[in-house]
Amino acid sequence: MPPGVEGQDILRACWAGTAAFTAVAVVTTVFPDPMAVPMAVASLGLLAAGCAAMLWAFQQALERSRYELIGVGGLYFLAGCAPRSVRLSMMAALALESAVALAAASVRPFTASAFGILVPVYALGLSGAWGARHGTFPPRPPEGTTPADVDPNRNGDHV
């Protein structure tokens, strides 16, 4: 976890969920029948938490978008709005969740391991929550003006 950055609580929650899912997925792959319910519950719980985080992030971004230029790539993938260490940490959690989900579902198709495919929504939702709460975005130009130095594709890459 990157030291000295804002949003440590979100980073810790993201990695805790990723670690819990990884542990449950590994055990479910080895013991598919007794772990079917825990795998489904863990996967659906992380999906629900990720969806809630995504909706909260979207609502916060709507409020901030009155004054700042916020893009989807910046909000959910932290492109240009977060320090590199935060972006790498959150995207590493997303990549790990995706890899574990695909591996578990590939090894044990047609079992509860397939529920794991839903889990990457968790890391993506928490990335959005971090971006909405702590992300730095360029200011929105005054109404009716389009200055040449405002590039909406820049999306805060000055961070």
PLM feature spans:
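Hydrophobic, membrane-facing alpha-helical anchors
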Residues: 1-5, 66-75
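Membrane-water interface of transmembrane alpha-helices
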Residues: 52-72
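Short membrane-interface loop/juxtamembrane segments of multi-pass integral membrane proteins
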Residues: 70-96
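Hydrophobic alpha-helical transmembrane segments and immediately flanking/interface helices
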Residues: 103-135
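Long, highly hydrophobic alpha-helical transmembrane signal-anchor segments
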Residues: 2-49, 90-93, 98-106
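Juxtamembrane transmembrane-helix termini
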Residues: 31-35, 60-67, 107, 111, ...
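Hydrophobic core segments of alpha-helical transmembrane domains
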Residues: 48-58, 123-131
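Cytosolic-side membrane-entry/anchor segment at the start of a transmembrane helix
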Residues: 1-22, 132-159
